[in-house]
Regions:
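Short, well-ordered amphipathic alpha-helical segments that serve as non-catalytic structural scaffolds
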Residues: 25-40, 66-70, 95-98, 162-169, ...
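Conserved beta-ketoacyl condensing-enzyme motif
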Residues: 21-111, 115-134, 204-220, 293, ...
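Flexible glycine-/small-residue-enriched beta->alpha junction loops
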Residues: 110-168
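Conserved catalytic cysteine-centered active-site region
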Residues: 23, 55-110, 143-145, 156-162, ...
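N-terminal extracellular/periplasmic Venus flytrap/periplasmic-binding protein-like
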Residues: 10, 22, 26-31, 42, ...
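Active-site-proximal alpha-helical scaffold in enzymes
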Residues: 85-117, 170-199, 262-269, 334-335, ...
Length: 402
């Protein structure tokens, strides 16, 4: 059997400390699951074979299997199980692939996949001392980056921060600051145009934020987009990760963001029994490992393998959703594929630099974005791909079924 993406919905992406900061991570995930079920009211919730959510943190309110907790909070029957997937930046894509495999095997006919991350609410964590009454405890902010580093791993592979890995790609592939800022500017302009034209709204469910002694705040647009930015403004920002000779800045990097997404997946049996119409077919996938110090190059080989498994080439693609962790990382991948920096197929409605990058959500967001873009344009094939911290790459090929 085959696996199909039927529908999907996401929250607007919130800034770090922004509009979604007051919402628990499990509640945020439940919100999009609940909306997905409302939008597909002909589906009996008891027929959902599994709820699979990506989440990269899992140290706070997203602990102890947030997918299961969100499923219950969304009102799904207790008989519907849940699983949380952690492949860092690609968690939301891995959840969809895991669900697709269940559908292909016939282990389920309908699956809800997706992802959640409230990076604002990532807690501090403290290690226990190595011995009773010891004083060698460590304290970490879990919102982003390494924690509890293994010295053996550090000795062999290093533990470069994500921004430093982007600087490593700048060095390796001779990517200029001007090109990075130009890429970032284009991302914001594309996202602004997509928002203003209502294309992003097709993916989004509004979030009502309770306020004391006031009406609820209605949150319905991604708040990380910067419509008024310019190349000149971006060029004035200081390097954020390498003070001397660096070129990766806050302006040409993705953000720390909050959000959730839910996707409805089904095989032919699930489509037929529930009267569902597929949006896209999941054709192939690939995941690879690369050197952790240049983790951003992971999409290159993963995409090449996924395309080969699908029996197509880059020339056959109508949309390419490449997560923009950093301008440098995206440009390194684009150039390695032999494509132009401004190829119109790449992130036509903006990407991680402009929309934001809530870690566990982005894979699901860009899978849905690619499917909706194919639906709008009548294109046939889409590629969805992300780099992953600690050196991996993930890619999925989809086919328009509309």
């Amino acid at each position: 059997m085959n696996a199909f993406l039927v529908d999907g919905v996401r929250t607007p992406v919130g800034n770090f400390g922004g509009t979604l900061a007051s919402i628990r991570t499990d509640d945020l995930a439940a919100l999009t699951i609940s909306e997905l079920l409302k939008r597909n009211s002909g589906l009996d919730p008891a027929l959902v074979g599994d709820v699979i959510l990506g989440c990269a943190n899992q140290a706070g309110e997203d602990n102890r299997n947030v997918a299961r907790m969100a499923s219950l909070l969304a009102g799904l029957p207790v008989s519907v199980p849940g699983e949380t997937v952690n492949r860092l930046c690609a968690s939301g894509l891995a959840s969809a692939v895991n669900g697709s495999r269940m559908l292909a095997l016939g282990d389920a006919d309908v699956v809800i996949a997706g992802g959640v991350e409230n990076m604002t609410r990532g807690p501090w964590v403290m290690s226990k001392a190595s011995k009773a009454f010891g004083r060698d405890s460590s304290l970490y902010d879990t919102s982003f980056g390494w924690r509890f580093i293994n010295p053996k791993l550090e000795a062999v592979y290093g533990v470069d921060g994500m921004g430093v890995t982007a600087e490593n790609l700048v060095d390796k592939y001779s990517i200029s600051r001007d090109d990075q800022d130009a890429f970032s500017f284009r991302s914001h302009m594309k996202a602004t145009a997509a928002r203003d034209a209502g294309r992003l709204a097709q993916e989004i469910v509004q979030v009502n934020i309770p306020r004391r002694k006031q009406d609820d705040l209605i949150f319905e647009h991604d708040e990380f987009i910067k419509p008024d930015t310019t190349v000149e403004i971006l060029s004035k920002l200081r390097p954020a990760f390498r003070k001397e000779g660096g070129s990766v800045t806050a302006g040409n990097s993705s953000g720390l963001n909050d959000g959730s997404a839910a996707l409805l997946l089904a095989n032919e049996s699930g489509l037929s029994s529930s009267g569902l119409t597929p949006l896209a077919q999941i054709i192939s996938s690939a995941v690879v490992g690369v050197e952790p110090r240049i983790m951003g190059i992971g999409p290159v080989r993963a995409s090449e393998i996924a395309l080969k498994r699908a029996g197509i080439t880059f020339d056959d693609l109508d949309v390419i959703e490449l997560n923009e962790a950093f301008s440098a990382q995206a440009l390194a991948c684009i150039r390695a594929w032999g494509l132009d920096d401004d190829d119109s197929r790449i992130n036509p409605n903006g990407g991680g630099i402009s929309i934001g990058h809530p870690l566990g959500v982005t894979g699901s967001r860009i899978l849905l974005a690619a499917a909706r873009q194919l639906e709008r344009t009548g294109g046939k094939y889409g590629l969805v791909t992300l780099c992953i911290g600690v050196g991996q790459g993930y890619a999925v090929v989809i086919k328009n079924t509309q």
